[in-house]
């Protein structure tokens, strides 16, 4: 937003006093255009300022007249414009001073109201300052040229005309001294313009580094290249004027000017060699990567040489990089830190692209030589860099030029499990390093507010969302990293966080650092939850204790989504339920990882759970998550198959009360389907009894009431609430030779019925509370189990229990054929008859 965009939003009474010397309605017509002109940089009264002020007055009148025509204003305003033109025509610098005063007042008012000026305004002012300085330099060079020609003519008439062409020095100064002084002043202005360019290059480098953390970055180097080339043109013109002045300058003055100009050129040339495409800042050995450099003055100096110079890429340590930064230092040294393959590329001009660059497409770090580390520093805290270097000769004198550019610091890893900690090192360095630092020095402690900005920037960039973190999120993060449960934002406002707290110290009661946990959240959200976060469906960064305070007074079924505090890369659902005593309770469902959500999405999981009703505070879940539900396929697919799906259920830690049920008068048999129209026979012979338990004090007499074709049916009396299946599942047979499910009596394989989400019940069997397994268990009787390779016994029934079951089976079978089976009595747990014969009952499914 522009400065005027903020001023126009302010109450009129706060800015009305600024428009005493200039009508306020005309200021409205000028709008943003006014702040796009160099009013603040015309502070002199020389010929350059006067000429530019006259041009600005004409532009102002034209802009006002055009604005009046567009808005259909009346002749009254046109009359004001005409009056304005006539007033300032005699002294255009007065108009410059008036507008400068208005803009300064507007900036002050905006600072008081909004505490900051808009960033586009800063960039616009910086651009205006450089362009105005460049125009002044061009004007100065023109004055120098006129003065030098006048001096060389050596006529009195020439000296008289000189006063009308240029600003003459103080009284008593001759033309030669005036030329020398003008050259020195212009060289000083060139040095100031060079400083602006170098500062702008440093800002570009810093922005490039911050872009590694996700900051926006205008990476085009074309504006910077244009600035550098324009300064080189000014340098060339000044150098020609110094050389052409000849005897008009003293040798000492000429040598001083030549040295200053050469230093300007040297600094520009060496500063214009930049790493345009940075190598990966977390670099794995034996992995190909790319990088690129650009020489902003290549089109000016390299031309079309027969053999373009080669750019070489080498790995350097932090110590070697520090030596490179020292003027006239020893350089990087001969010792190699790492071997890079395919590390030379020619530096070539591209006329269509208007640039001079070298792109390394197939770099590969073959190996790395670790240097000595400081104290407890790990290998993922060791920073290196890639040094790009090239050399060529400049000008007719074949002046040797050495170009060097250092990449951003990078961390070399040899295994993927080092990636997380390496990213922490790079994040910290990118965020908190200073411009023009000694490589690669960075603060050990930083203000928590800066850390919040960094985490927010990284989160938005990594996830790919425009929804950043909220103040409540930062409060939770502060509590986590400082191990402080303060509930006030002000408690953390002036605190600082250390590198150790960020990624060296293990969080209290956990097995990971703060960054490792936060990076897990980043990865999970990026891979599975971007749309949910962007739709503000996830609170995310909130403690379990705060969740309880939010949900405890909400209706049953109210839920919210939060990132797991105890696991890396997990999200959990917290919801309100009623306990057995009727009091509200908060349950947190086991966290879902990225792998879990790749199997079934978060939205579909929420749809599966009927107990979830409203997203906190009061938004119906179907309204909130409908766009995230996967459409259900109806009918058969293209191959003729009926679609199957996986659905999620949740185990209750305390099962609901079970109504008292009655044992049926008949126990049905379960046909395995191994042979048509037949059932598995089971003879209880002495030779089939497993010797697992010591012999009972008494034994069961052999039972001969069943023929080999008849079945003995044994009811499972154990309830397994974790075996919960949705009602849409099909059937499958359980092989007879599989081990018996844990917690069930050995019996013939049967088709079990499950009512989800509650304990397992057979579809056509009701249960009594006093089952055979609720009786005291004594020694295991002989002659009971049919074979130890079929279903190994868990809890041995008594002789009385077995006899009762066998007699019931005999009496109800009707001499070998089962009679009519009773209907299933109503169950508290939901629908009955959901067959799970196709499921492995030994498993503990989560769906």
Swiss-Prot record:
It is found in: Cytoplasm; Nucleus. Changing residue 805 to A: Abolishes the interaction with NCOA1. Residues 809-847 are annotated as: Disordered. The keyword Nucleus applies. Tyrosine phosphorylated on Tyr-641 following stimulation by IL4/interleukin-4. Tyrosine phosphorylated following stimulation by IL3/interleukin-3. Dephosphorylation on tyrosine residues by PTPN2 negatively regulates the IL4/interleukin-4 mediated signaling. Mono-ADP-ribosylated by PARP14. SMART domains: SH2 (SM00252), STAT_int (SM00964). CDD domains: SH2_STAT6, STAT6_CCD, STAT6_DBD. It comes from the Eukaryota. Keywords: Acetylation, Activator, ADP-ribosylation, Cytoplasm, Disease variant, DNA-binding, Nucleus, Phosphoprotein, SH2 domain, Transcription, Transcription regulation. Belongs to the transcription factor STAT family. Forms a homodimer or a heterodimer with a related family member. Interacts with NCOA1 via its C-terminal LXXLL motif. This is Signal transducer and activator of transcription 6.
